[in-house]
Amino acid sequence: MSLLRNRLQDLPALCLCVLVLACIGACQSEAYEGTPSPPPKLKMSHWSLVMGRMKELLEPVLNRTRDRWQWFWSPSTFRGFMQTYYDDHLRDLGPRTKAWLLKSKESLLNKTHSLCPRIVCGDKDQG
């Protein structure tokens, strides 16, 4: 059950990564729209035909998706999303991290002290 709980805690970070990758993809696709087509010699290669066919199939899907999500890419919507994400997940990250580090340090010191008599000092009963 704890494994599932850890995965659910990672979900917001995963959603943010997917969102950022989608933003990058949308920006890059707009940058490539004005690029010239390759020379005719390169158009005839097998991989160029495959790439052309894939572009032909995916371009309408990408355009429809971009049009549907255009409202989301506006600066005010995206800024609002990022602010909400920060407020919900990152605002108290510093204190949480500090508390976790202190707890981990204490745990490590306790484990080290419990091992000390056996490894360094030896058992007192063996005398």
Curated annotation (Swiss-Prot):
Record's subcellular location: Secreted
Top-level division of the source organism's lineage: Eukaryota
Signal peptide feature range: 1-27
SS bond partners: none
GO biological process per UniProt: lipid transport; positive regulation of triglyceride storage; triglyceride homeostasis
One of the record's GO cellular component terms: very-low-density lipoprotein particle
UniProt key word Signal: yes
Keywords: Lipid transport, Secreted, Signal, Transport
Alphabetical list of Pfam families matching this protein: APOC4
Role noted for this protein: May participate in lipoprotein metabolism.
Family as reported in the entry's similarity comment: Belongs to the apolipoprotein C4 family.
PANTHER family membership: APOLIPOPROTEIN C-IV
Listed name of the protein: Apolipoprotein C-IV
